[in-house]
């Protein structure tokens, strides 16, 4: 049986709980907001993690922190977000991207991971490696320094002295 674990709060939480009860769904578990240090244990208890946002122009430039947290815990992501987040997930080979608000695609993606656990584990590993490589503090600091150097238009020799 596929079980959905929904952790945290949100504007739609009570409506979703009521809808699940009305439909007699027994495979949904709701957990209240948790302390930040407890979140990785919930993520690691999952076979795949969902990041779903409404289809909106605004969200095309968003990179949900949840997505990076899930990837850092080596969990494959089912992503219903367009734009930058989707590009990152594809480059990382860390999950499956679906169209936002496409319930049929969501069902298919959940079923895929339920039936293909090894593929999910591989995507999870890919995502973790990508996050470590591309989003570590060291990597971010190096990118930031390069941008500053370009903005300051420092000659190559001067850059070497600063880095030393």
Predicted region positions:
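Conserved acidic donor-binding loop of glycosyltransferase catalytic domains
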Residues: 52-53, 79-81, 90, 98-99
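Nucleotide-activated donor-binding/catalytic signature segment of Leloir-type glycosyltransferases, i.e.
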Residues: 5-8, 13-41
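Conserved donor-binding/catalytic loop of nucleotide-activated donor transferases
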Residues: 44-47, 68-76, 91-92, 98
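Acidic donor-binding loop of glycosyltransferase active sites
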Residues: 25, 43-60, 75-76
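C-terminal alpha-helical cap of glycosyltransferases
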Residues: 137-164
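A short, well-ordered alpha-helix in the C-terminal region of glycosyltransferases
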Residues: 105, 112, 119-133, 143-146
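Short alpha-helical segment that forms part of, or immediately flanks, the ligand-binding pocket
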Residues: 37-40, 64-73, 83-87
């Amino acid at each position: 049986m596929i079980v959905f674990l929904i952790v945290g709060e949100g504007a739609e939480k009570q409506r979703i709980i009521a809808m699940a009860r009305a439909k007699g769904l027994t495979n949904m578990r709701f957990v209240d907001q948790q302390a930040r240090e407890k979140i990785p244990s919930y993520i690691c208890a999952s076979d795949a993690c969902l990041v779903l946002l409404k289809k909106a122009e605004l969200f095309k430039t968003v990179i949900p922190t949840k997505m990076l947290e899930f990837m850092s815990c080596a969990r494959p992501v089912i992503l219903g977000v367009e734009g930058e987040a989707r590009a990152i997930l594809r480059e990382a080979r860390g999950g499956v991207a679906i169209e936002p608000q496409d319930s049929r695609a969501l069902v298919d993606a959940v079923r895929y991971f339920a039936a293909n656990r090894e593929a999910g584990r591989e995507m999870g590993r890919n995502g973790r490696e990508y996050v470590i490589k591309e989003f570590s503090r060291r990597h971010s600091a190096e990118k930031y320094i390069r941008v500053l150097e370009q903005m300051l238009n420092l000659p190559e020799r001067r850059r070497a002295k600063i880095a030393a």
